[in-house]
Amino acid sequence: GGGGKIDNWFGRPIEWFHVGDDHSYIAISSGGKGDATHWTSHFTGFKHIGIVVPDVEALIERLSKAGYELDHLGDEHPFRKNVYYLEDHGMLFEFIEYFSEKGCERNDYIQ
C-alpha cells in the first residue's frame, strides 16, 4: 500500500496511509479538526470514495453527457490518471485509471 506525508494540505500538514492491498484499500489520514464539511476542510471522518475505471477520458465524457461537472483533476503521474467529482451532498468521488499492473507503481506518491 501507499502512504506518506503532505506538508501543506490546504494549510495543514497531514500524514496518510493505505489499509488494504495493491488493488483495494482505504486511505486513512491525520489532521482532522472539527465537524465534517467540504472535502477540502480538515475534519476527522470520511473524505472520498475511489473507484478504478478502465478509461478516465471515456468516463469524463459519459458523466458530462449525464450533466455532471468535473470538480478537479488529480496530479499528473506516469502510472495513473485520476479525476474528482463532487456530488450535491458534499461527497467526493475519485475515478482512477491505472497505467501499470505493479502495486509499487500504482501506489507511488513520490513522483
State where each predicted segment sits.
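Active-site donor-binding loop signature of nucleotide-sugar glycosyltransferases
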Residues: V19, S30, E97
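Short, surface-exposed linear segments at secondary-structure transitions and domain or protein termini
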Residues: D35-T40, C104-N107
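Short, structured motif recognition centered on aromatic/hydrophobic residues
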Residues: I26, F46, F93-F95
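Vicinal oxygen chelate
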Residues: I14-D21, T37-Q111
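A cross-kingdom feature marking solvent-exposed beta-strand/loop segments within repeated
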Residues: K33-T37, H72-L73
